[in-house]
């Protein structure tokens, strides 16, 4: 299993819009083959930081999602919401 931890920093005046976009993306992810689960974490120290942890069955399945037209639609306009580029890292899930 693969865990993908991604930090997003929304522009201060776009936090609500950014959360809605990420929630919409999560809904789209949940319909994709190989999706397992998704959690959204909100930073206690930085109100603009939204982190997601998404679990997929395999690295290849996640790569397929990243290249999908469904993801492109779900994340359309996202770049205008971030104060800096998102940072993502892939992890093996411990059993």
Feature annotation, model-predicted:
Residues 2-8, 39-66:
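Short, well-ordered beta-strand segments in beta-rich or mixed alpha/beta enzyme
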Residues 1-2, 95:
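Absolute protein N-terminus
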Residues 24-36, 55-89:
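An amphipathic, aromatic/His-enriched active-site/gating alpha helix that lines ligand/cofactor pockets
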Residues 9-21:
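Short, surface-exposed ligand-recognition loops at beta-strand->loop->(often short) alpha-helix junctions
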Residues 11-13, 59, 93:
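Generic structural motif
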Residues 41, 89-94:
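Flexible, low-complexity linkers/stalks enriched in Thr/Pro that connect modular domains
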């Amino acid at each position: 299993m693969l865990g993908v931890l991604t930090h997003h920093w929304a522009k201060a005046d776009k936090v609500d819009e950014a959360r809605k976009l990420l929630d919409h993306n999560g809904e789209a992810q949940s319909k994709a083959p190989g999706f397992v689960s998704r959690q959204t974490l909100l930073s206690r120290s930085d109100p603009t930081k939204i982190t997601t942890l998404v679990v997929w069955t395999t690295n290849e399945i996640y790569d397929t999602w990243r290249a999908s037209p469904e993801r492109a639609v779900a994340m359309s306009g996202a770049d205008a919401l971030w104060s800096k580029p998102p940072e993502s890292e892939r992890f093996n899930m411990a059993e």
